[in-house]
């Protein structure tokens, strides 16, 4: 019998007797006062079930409600998802995706009614609840060409202009902002400084930011923020550099952990603060899970650097040299830096093939990553392009990829992949500021995560990636509801 409730750093409650252990506050509260009392407050509650099941062609289908009945000690032979609302962890900042040049250009090639449909599908009241928008500062691979916002060799940055973005990107971002409302959360990432600031004199294929341009480049971020905010787009945050360890055929720039730290400590951080942008959330790393712990522990080892960083961003592409995703590196990093939030800043399925856009494996890739990322402490989750065309682009270096929504710009047809529905099982029902609560499974084939929304709704997402149908039980403090988890399905249960 427990006599303590564990609650992670970041709780707004004013408890007494806090003691910091392993990055979490252990709060001394009597068992009979607050522990194991979910059903005392929620007697008779049923669970609404939403299911996506590829074999039955069901997509976010309402399956009715399930009742909870007394269920004592589960046996090892009984499949269960265990949820304990007493154990509370990180709060959700939000879920969303990137509005890149490619997404925006594709968007404005579509008929007006399709544009409206896509905005509603992601950001509207009947959509899947996206609140996060990421974009690129300067060009990236998902641009139609390379570009910057200044004339060559303009160290004064007097020529700075975001006119390029006003044609497609800014209008689409503002459409999303209008639909989202107050929860709109926008951040940006640079892929490369202008070529003349770099060691290789190219925006492509890596290279480094030359030392003499560190401050000029820091000032560039300020210009970008001011121009976007002048247009009514409030900037919530930024990453220092997209994928700082990748020498790509597209826009890229290399920083070691020490170099990123020096740039943040001596240039970017002070420049943001000096210009009144202390509230902007700076995220370091913004690359794969494989090196996240090493980068964080190195870059943030200096308190004078760490004070400028609010979060640690990461991508999912470590499988290029690993068989599986390295989720455990996230929890290790979170334990090391309980005062920094973890942010998934990019992921997509590469090697686009139009004939495979309805494969359920696309959705399962997203479900597997989202559930594990949240269970390891992630507070913000951002997909890559929200929209791409029938080629998986446009992309000026031929790096064509999948997206949750694919639009055929020749016919005007809009395709919703399983990526869209699997993400929606999380993003539509788990709201910003929801708090993750304790969840585990006694079957490897079933993975799950749970959050408590601010209105008291308890939301559990369960995925079965196996080839077998599984009957399971959603078990909460001695009460359980029977659920069917069909092969290759995902479901959301809302209490």
For each of these PLM feature ranges, what is it?
Residues 94-98, 132-134, 183-187, 234-239, ...:
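Structural preference for beta-strand elements that scaffold enzyme active sites
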Residues 485-495:
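C-terminal beta-strand-rich structural cap/linker in extracellular carbohydrate-active enzymes
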């Amino acid at each position: 019998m427990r006599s303590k409730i564990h609650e992670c750093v970041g709780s707004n409650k004013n408890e007494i007797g806090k003691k910091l252990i392993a990055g979490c506050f252990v709060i001394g509260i009597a068992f009979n006062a607050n522990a194991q009392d979910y059903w005392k407050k929620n007697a008779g509650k049923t669970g609404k079930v939403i299911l996506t099941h590829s074999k039955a062609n069901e997509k976010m289908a309402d399956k009715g409600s399930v009742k909870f009945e007394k269920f004592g000690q589960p046996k090892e032979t009984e499949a269960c998802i265990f949820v304990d609302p007493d154990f509370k962890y990180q709060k959700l900042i939000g879920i969303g995706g990137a509005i890149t040049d490619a997404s925006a250009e594709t968007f404005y090639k579509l008929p007006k009614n399709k544009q409206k449909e896509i905005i509603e599908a992601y950001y509207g009241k009947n959509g899947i609840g996206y609140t996060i928008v990421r974009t690129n500062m300067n060009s990236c691979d998902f641009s139609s060409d390379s570009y910057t916002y200044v004339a060559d060799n303009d160290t004064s940055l007097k020529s700075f202009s975001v006119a390029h973005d006003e044609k497609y990107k800014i209008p689409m971002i503002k459409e999303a902002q209008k639909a989202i409302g107050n929860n709109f959360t926008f951040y940006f990432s640079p892929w490369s400084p202008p070529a003349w600031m770099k060691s290789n004199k190219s925006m492509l294929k890596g290279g480094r930011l030359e030392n003499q341009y560190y401050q000029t480049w820091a000032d560039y971020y300020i210009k970008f923020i001011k121009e976007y905010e002048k247009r009514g787009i409030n900037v919530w945050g930024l990453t220092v550099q997209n994928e700082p360890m990748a020498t790509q055929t597209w826009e890229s720039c290399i920083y070691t952990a020490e170099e990123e730290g020096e740039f943040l400590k001596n240039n970017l951080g002070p420049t943001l603060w000096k210009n009144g942008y202390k509230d902007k959330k700076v995220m370091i790393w913004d690359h794969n899970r494989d090196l996240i712990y090493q980068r964080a522990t190195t870059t943030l080892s200096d308190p004078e650097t760490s004070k400028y960083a609010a979060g640690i961003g990461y991508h999912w592409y470590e499988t290029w040299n690993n068989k599986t995703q390295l989720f455990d590196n996230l929890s290790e990093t979170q334990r090391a830096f309980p005062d920094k939030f973890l942010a998934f800043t990019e992921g997509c399925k590469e090697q686009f093939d139009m004939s495979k856009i309805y494969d359920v494996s696309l959705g399962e890739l997203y479900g597997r990553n989202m559930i594990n990322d949240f269970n390891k402490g992630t507070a913000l989750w951002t997909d890559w392009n929200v929209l791409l065309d029938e080629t998986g682009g446009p992309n000026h270096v031929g790096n064509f990829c999948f997206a949750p929504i694919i639009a055929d710009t020749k016919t005007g047809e809009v395709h919703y992949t399983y990526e869209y529905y699997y993400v929606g099982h999380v993003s539509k029902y788990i709201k910003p500021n929801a708090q993750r609560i304790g969840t585990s499974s006694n079957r490897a084939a079933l993975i799950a995560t749970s959050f408590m929304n601010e209105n008291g709704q308890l939301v559990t997402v369960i995925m079965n990636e196996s080839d077998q149908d599984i009957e399971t039980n959603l078990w909460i403090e001695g009460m359980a509801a029977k659920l069917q988890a069909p092969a290759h399905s995902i479901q959301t249960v809302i209490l």
